[in-house]
Swiss-Prot record:
Gene3D superfamilies: Nucleic acid-binding proteins. GO terms for biological process: translation. It comes from the Bacteria. The lineage of its organism: Bacteria, Pseudomonadati, Pseudomonadota, Gammaproteobacteria, Vibrionales. Part of the 30S ribosomal subunit. Contacts proteins S8 and S17. May interact with IF1 in the 30S initiation complex. The keyword RNA-binding applies. With S4 and S5 plays an important role in translational accuracy. Interacts with and stabilizes bases of the 16S rRNA that are involved in tRNA selection in the A site and with the mRNA backbone. Located at the interface of the 30S and 50S subunits, it traverses the body of the 30S subunit contacting proteins on the other side and probably holding the rRNA structure together. The combined cluster of proteins S8, S12 and S17 appears to hold together the shoulder and platform of the 30S subunit. The modification 3-methylthioaspartic acid is found at residue 89. SUPFAM superfamilies: Nucleic acid-binding proteins. This is Small ribosomal subunit protein uS12. GO terms for cellular component: small ribosomal subunit. Belongs to the universal ribosomal protein uS12 family. Keywords: Methylation, Ribonucleoprotein, Ribosomal protein, RNA-binding, rRNA-binding, tRNA-binding. Pfam families: Ribosom_S12_S23.
Length: 124
């Protein structure tokens, strides 16, 4: 235990919390341009073709972002909005694309959890 005198001379160092989403630079979302849209396979024990895209952000970072939902309209040079949130079974994927924003369309025929997939309220 440090004495009062020692603490007066040299205060305790603050612990620095490391961000899980450094490319967002303390912003809720960031805009970027797709440089590559492709599928990748998850870690064991899961098996699928997960849709992901490589995105060059407005602040210069290049990140990999997951495209949620069934089907998408993204291609190279599409402008997308990125939010934080990793995909547990895809190593290196720490961001999600926001559906229904900018060039990324919402999911077709989506009835439940619509707000997460950029879908307007259906008529009646």
């Amino acid at each position: 235990m440090a004495t009062i005198n020692q603490l007066v001379r040299k205060p305790r160092a603050k612990q620095v919390v490391k961000s899980n989403v450094p490319a967002l630079a303390a912003c809720p979302q960031k805009r970027g341009v797709c440089t590559r849209v492709y599928t990748t396979t998850p870690r064991k024990p899961n098996s699928a073709l997960r849709k992901v895209c490589r995105v060059r952000l407005t602040n210069g970072f290049e990140v990999t972002s997951y495209i949620g939902g069934e089907g998408h309209n993204l291609q190279e040079h599409s402008v997308v909005l990125i939010r934080g949130g990793r995909v547990k079974d895809l190593p290196g994927v720490r961001y999600h694309t926001v559906r229904g924003a900018l060039d990324c369309a919402g999911v077709n025929d989506r009835k439940q959890a619509r707000s997460k997939y950029g879908v307007k309220r259906p008529k009646s």
